[in-house]
Amino acid sequence: MALLILGPLIGTAAAQSLTYPDLVRRLVDLEHLATLPQAGERTTQWSSYDRRSRIEPATGRFLDWHANADGHGVIRREGNLQVLAEMKGPGVLWRMWSASPKQGRVRIYLDDAPEPAVDLPFLGYFNREHAPFDRPALVHTAARGWNNYTPIPYQTSCKIVAEEGWGDYYHFTYTTFPEGTVVPTFRSELSAEDRSALEELDRLLQQCGPRVPQDSLGRDTFEGILGPGDGHALRRTGPAAITFLRARVEGLTRPADEEALRELVLEITWDDEARPAVWSPLGDFFGTAPGANPYRSLPCGLTEDGWFYAQWYMPFGRSAEVRLLNEGAQPRKVHLEVFTERLRRPPESYGRFHAKWHRDEFLPTEATRELDWPLLKTRGRGRYVGAMLHVWNPRGGWWGEGDEKFFVDGEPFPSTFGTGSEDYFGYAWGCPDLFQHAYHNQTRNDGNNKGHISVNRWHIAEQVPFQESFEAYLEKYFSNGRPTLYAATVYWYLAPGGHDPYAPVPLEHRVGYARAPSYKPIPGAVEGERLKILECSRGRVREQDMSGWGEDWSHDAQLWWTGAQPGDRLDLELVVERTARYRVEARFTRAPDYGIVQLFLNGAKLGHPVDLYAPAVLPFGPVSLGTNALAAGTHVLSVEMAGANPEAAPAYLFGLDYIRLTPLDSQSEDLSTDEPR
């Protein structure tokens, strides 16, 4: 397996010849990431992004820049077929992804051949029922996202067309090699040698984890206690490369680990440069935050015994200094190990590894780009190789609607334009399920996308080369004021002398910002989602997170009744603390598919029927339902589905934000009833 990782070094001359096993090795070749890209080498992506997003040629202005119908965009239609992707060679398709592949056929034509090299239902590229797309590590689902990492090379051209019914959402990520590169034309029936390469790769990817070097140039270690403000540096002279780095912090427990791993900082400086190329809170550097969240991927991870590991290939010329700092108030016992190897190329043929943690750096000022959150901005020659995103989303709701956009070498329109943040990270439909894989991971999700979320994506084969500059953005729909807050660690290689604009971030901006929103209590209100369900004649009753529709619902939630029909009834238990006469009010939700309901209290009608139709999702009320004398104890609040507004979609949904009981004393008692509108 080590031979597959290292492999025979593939030359960097423009006129190179790559076999299929050579291309397979690129999926695990971490050293190749460090080599500086050749002129003419590009990695781009075709996707189903909303084609209304475009650029105005005369002015360069972005138009409909945040259009969001991203499921079915295509290049063009040819008769009954849709052209999904079209590339000139020599190149290789590295990655396919979809949120919902279906039975409509997708055909891949290579090198101007009249017959497709592959002709399958789109689902067939992902369900592992068709060779060679049947290796579980290369072809897999992750939190409802369908991924296929089987390389498909072509010499002169690649065209992907689809019949109707192919599904929803797609990505095709590919690299174009410099002119003169020779690659084989992909065939579904692989040779024995090609099959063997794929099998070995698949086995390796299924066994991701730390590979401690057994025969290295050197091993430098530190074990000790770092007091507040202390640091320790490990220094190595070159030329050489760090190929394995691991760290452990003793005594970490949740939730204290979240702050500790942000207080500890990892810095790496190459060749005595004035500023570190690597600067990150310790935990974030290894691809997960906040806290210690075990996972295993190809370049980095955290093992169950508490060892963080990174096996990025990190070359240097004269020197490398790896420094661990404790900027917190508590002493920390830490372990740090750094392994180096001899270079197998001249130092000048490599870029230097960069990894930087930041929050809200270099936000755009153009009015048309207010949603574009900058992931990375850099200048020079190098390769973008991945990112970890930590989201603090205390109100819940779907945070990741925004697309990724990559601008390479100053291009006016992004050559990578995605379809959603979770799509970029290889999953789909905002699914909160944790997953781990060689190339992408969801290492933390506190539940239903509420609280802390941590995701990463590693561009190993499909790294993005650039000659002059690289800018990456993620659209961010939820504002900081909501609050929904992003923090990212980005990873890239950059030629010496390139521009890395990211400075160290003070401790006060790294910890303490993840604060939950406060809710002003409503006197006498009983939250609908907290009411005990006594009986439901049909359908399903559950709590629904309403934070995605604004901040107007009490505690960002409601009781939600779905699947009802006219005449159905829902009985809820209402607890009254003391005997009194009460004004009864309720706050509901109105929406295009909500019904008309009649409320009852202990079998007696409460007011008139309430029409909950509206053309948009809106809070409604509080609606006065009259006054009632109620004894202390339990009572039955009933909801009867009476029908629907003629304008409403006939789904007969019902949402209750809260019911409020206000006691009336003898001086202020008001027996009048405000009728529902």
Spans of model-derived segments:
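Bacterial N-terminal signal peptides
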Residues: 1-9
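Amphipathic, alpha-helical segments enriched in basic
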Residues: 2, 71, 135, 147, ...
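Sec/Tat signal peptide C-region and signal peptidase I cleavage site
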Residues: 11-14
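Beta-strand-centric surfaces of beta-sandwich/beta-rich domains
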Residues: 16-519
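Extracytoplasmic
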Residues: 408, 509-672
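Short, low-complexity, charge-dense intrinsically disordered segments
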Residues: 673-677
